[in-house]
């Protein structure tokens, strides 16, 4: 009785699965702890990298809420003509962490904090 996969084929398949899982890991959201570590580990550029990440997270959160609204979900973020600029990302994020410090654990994603912050500041 022959096996459908040779041992080389099984190792190749296992390698592909491991690589795919590795790529899935790189696509995960940054946690609060990782964002703080980014600032500490790289003193010269860490703050800039964190700022870029927060701005991107803020824009992605607004776009995701708008897409969900177009798909029929109730909106959570309503700008209503108020301004939302990239320079506001850090202050909105930091204010949410201060306001609800007991709710957030270090392993929670930054995107969750940003969604709650924007929903609070720009409530519907």
Please provide the spans of the model-predicted regions:
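Short N-proximal segments of mature Sec-exported proteins
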Residues: 30-94, 117
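Absolute protein N-terminus
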Residues: 1, 28-30
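Surface-exposed, polar helix/loop patches in the mature regions of secreted/periplasmic/lumenal proteins
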Residues: 88-124
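Bacterial N-terminal signal peptides that target proteins for export
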Residues: 2-13
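N-terminal signal peptide c-region/cleavage motif recognized by signal peptidases
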Residues: 21-26
């Amino acid at each position: 009785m022959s096996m459908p996969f040779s041992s080389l084929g099984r190792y190749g398949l296992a390698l592909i699965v491991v690589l795919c899982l590795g790529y899935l890991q790189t696509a995960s959201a940054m946690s609060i702890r990782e964002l703080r570590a980014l600032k500490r580990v790289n003193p010269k550029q860490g703050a800039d990298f964190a700022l870029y990440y927060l701005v991107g997270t803020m824009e992605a959160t607004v776009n995701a809420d708008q897409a969900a609204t177009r798909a029929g979900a109730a909106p959570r973020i309503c700008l209503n003509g108020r301004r939302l600029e990239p320079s506001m990302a850090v202050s909105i994020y930091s204010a949410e962490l201060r306001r609800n410090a007991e709710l957030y654990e270090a392993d929670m994603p930054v995107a969750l904090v940003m969604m709650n912050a924007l929903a609070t500041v720009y409530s519907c």
